[in-house]
């Protein structure tokens, strides 16, 4: 039987990375296995992934050398960042650059980079309908990820740029979930009128 190809998954104990890691581990016929990358290999979530068969390895997006070690011998990687941990476009770009540099160094065959579109392509900085933030962004957590795309392309890393939809878990993480009203009923409100919201569960 052919040896399974290793996919290094950043954010493996988070929503997006965790969903992917479990999907791979639960599909015995996929031909892939998971190297779960996390800053804390002793966390409960890391231990759960290990029980499912993942190789759990310590790595930090702020530490290029740790990423190089973690990517060594892997076929590919799933790269994702968590903007809300620092609220810094500069850090977002620096983290993506470290991932791309490590991927090139390790000779990965393929990378999936979880990114967003650049909102400035649709709402220019000159458009006053939305404020310009930090001097150069309309939606910093979108625009910075889009800027970071070039970290992979300029290094010649074979990359799929994944633009996923909003995921339902965000309603819980960001306090937008159902609220109990005076009558005891749970209400869920999202002021969007008749507009549609594409969404999925991160686990899917």
Language-model features and meaning:
Residues 2-48, 62-72, 76-93, 101-112, ...:
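Oxidoreductase cofactor-interface core, primarily capturing Rossmann-like NAD(P)-dependent enzymes
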Residues 53-54, 159:
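Short, conserved active-site loop motifs that form the nucleotide-linked donor/cofactor pocket
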Residues 59:
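Cofactor-binding loops of NAD(P)H-dependent oxidoreductases
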């Amino acid at each position: 039987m052919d040896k399974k190809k290793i996919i290094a998954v950043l954010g493996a104990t988070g929503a997006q990375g965790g969903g992917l890691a479990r999907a791979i581990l639960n599909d015995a016929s996929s031909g892939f296995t998971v190297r779960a990358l996390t800053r804390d290999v002793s966390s409960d979530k890391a231990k759960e992934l290990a029980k499912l068969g993942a190789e759990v390895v310590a790595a930090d997006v702020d530490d290029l050398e740790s990423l190089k070690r973690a990517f060594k011998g892997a076929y590919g990687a799933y790269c994702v960042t968590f903007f809300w941990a620092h609220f810094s476009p500069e850090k977002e770009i620096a983290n993506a650059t470290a991932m791309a540099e490590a991927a090139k160094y390790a000779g990965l065959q393929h990378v999936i980079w979880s990114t967003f579109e650049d909102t400035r392509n649709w709402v220019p900085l000159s458009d006053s309908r939305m404020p310009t933030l930090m001097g150069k962004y309309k939606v910093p957590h979108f625009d910075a990820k889009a800027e970071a795309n070039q970290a992979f392309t300029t290094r010649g890393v074979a990359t799929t740029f994944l633009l996923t939809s909003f995921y339902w878990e965000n309603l819980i993480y960001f306090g937008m979930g159902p609220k109990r009203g005076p009558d005891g009923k749970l209400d869920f409100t999202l002021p969007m009128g008749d507009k549609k919201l594409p969404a999925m569960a991160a686990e899917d």
